[in-house]
């Protein structure tokens, strides 16, 4: 009878460890996409800043937009897919909604169709480049059924719409500042989500 109590306690501790691992994975489900797309937005802003100081040609900026976001989107989904796989292997919580396999395959399959059949999306994106990461965050949120990511996608989409009108008004530095603020906001959100994740539980040894 005495030997059964430590065994039962060890079982409960194991269940608690599994629960904590799943909570950590859920937090990373939020923090990883915000980190990836926040970094991509900031990199895009830096590229635009370098172009603005190097040339006054609007065609150069448009060329960057045509190339950057399709490639950056591919890098983003591949990075998230690899991250989710590493979390599943390390914490043993499985892929579940954190798996980006279908999203990655769908992105690469649909990208040529978008280029050929929905070219106006790219043209519109020239005037509101934040709409591209907003759409990708929305796709991730839909895949994971995650409310926080849906709110983040909506906020980025609103920023993209504002950027569209700022571009139409020919205010050169305002869209760049908006992208920097948006990217920084996503990174801050990622850091907050990561800090809220429980620390890795220590291994427990049953007393026999």
Model-derived segments and spans:
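Intrinsically disordered, low-complexity segments enriched in small/polar residues
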Residues: 7, 90, 123-126
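Membrane interfacial helix motifs at helix-loop boundaries and amphipathic/re-entrant anchors
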Residues: 46-68, 116-130, 161-180
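Membrane-proximal helix-loop-helix units in multi-pass membrane proteins
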Residues: 98-99, 103-158
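Hydrophobic core of alpha-helical transmembrane segments in multi-pass integral membrane proteins
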Residues: 69-83, 106-119, 159-161, 180-195
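Terminal transmembrane helical module of multi-pass membrane proteins
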Residues: 135-208
């Amino acid at each position: 009878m005495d030997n059964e109590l430590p065994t039962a306690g060890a079982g409960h501790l194991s269940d608690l460890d599994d629960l904590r691992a799943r909570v950590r994975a859920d937090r990373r489900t939020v923090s990883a996409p915000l980190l990836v797309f926040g970094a991509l937005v900031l990199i895009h802003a830096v590229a635009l800043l370098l172009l603005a100081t190097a040339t006054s040609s609007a065609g150069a900026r448009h060329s960057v937009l045509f190339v950057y976001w399709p490639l950056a989107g591919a890098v983003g989904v591949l990075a998230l897919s690899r991250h989710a796989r590493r979390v599943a292997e390390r914490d043993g919580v499985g892929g579940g909604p954190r798996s980006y396999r279908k999203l990655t395959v769908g992105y690469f399959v649909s990208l040529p169709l978008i280029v050929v059949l929905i070219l106006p999306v790219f043209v519109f994106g020239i005037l509101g480049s934040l709409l591209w990461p907003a759409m990708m965050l929305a796709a991730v949120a839909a895949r994971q059924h995650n409310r926080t990511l849906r709110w983040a996608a909506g906020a980025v989409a609103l920023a993209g719409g504002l950027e569209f009108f700022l571009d139409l008004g020919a205010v050169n530095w305002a869209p760049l500042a908006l992208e920097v603020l948006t990217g920084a906001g996503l990174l801050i959100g990622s850091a907050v989500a990561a800090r809220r994740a429980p620390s890795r539980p220590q291994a427990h040894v049953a007393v026999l």
